[in-house]
């Protein structure tokens, strides 16, 4: 828990705003996280992006992001370094992704046994993720977009042919295709029938 002290003075503004935002972790934060992981039975890593990184015309100084434009689709490098360092500890690890767009996380997909895509889950997101992790809720979602392995799988922005665009025209194997999703339950779809009464 953290104690926060907020002071607000009404000036000539019409509104007030407070945000808690992601910032690039410093060296001490990484060491602290590794120390916490060493003393834990299980590690739940919440990684990804924020609207500050993905938003338009944002002033951020993070490698791979330029004023809201993504120069790469990988997780931020500092996050990947932390994930790899914690993975070396040999602790059971769950990766919870928080983002609003597709990410490339090839190493994590191969090495982290449990990954949950939470998107931007809102104020009750922690409870929702906990319900999934503890088995109180059975996840059954499917990806509404394709997750590519790298920028090289994306079609050229200036090429307006359909080759490689969306899951329908992609010939390579993506990291996770449109519609991908796992569940604690096995689902099967049979031959659908329609009883037309009119």
Which role does the model predict for each range below?
Residues 1-198:
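C-terminal non-catalytic regions of proteins with extracellular/luminal or membrane-system context
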